[in-house]
Amino acid sequence: MKWIVIDTIIQPSCGISFSAIWGNMKMIIWYQSTIFLPPGSIFTPVKSGIILKDKEYPITIYNIAPFNKDLWSLLKSSQECPPGESKITNKCLHNSCIIKICPYGLK
């Protein structure tokens, strides 16, 4: 089954991400990975992780739940990344970010 990413939220201090996805229904996945799942990505879940663009990546999925608009709004409002002021300077202001390559292109 292929899943399509609608939106993704990253918490850089802990490396946890949340993605709104579409499979058989709209869902929210809570996961940890070394890769970023940008909106529009299409991936297939497998036992050891996911297959994205014909390559297998490890991913730890903590939970999958039906999409809830209120929960998604709460997650978006507490999003640490990317901070608005960083867009102006192109510099990340998070000293505790554990993500090696910024998916937003910040340095």
UniProtKB/Swiss-Prot annotation:
Its main location: cytoplasm. InterPro entries: Anti-adapter_IraM, PmrD_sf. The keyword Cytoplasm applies. One of its GO terms (biological process) is cellular response to starvation. It is found in: Cytoplasm. Keywords: Cytoplasm, Stress response. Inhibits RpoS proteolysis by regulating RssB activity, thereby increasing the stability of the sigma stress factor RpoS during magnesium starvation. Belongs to the IraM/RssC family. This is Anti-adapter protein IraM. It comes from Escherichia coli (strain 55989 / EAEC). The gene is iraM.
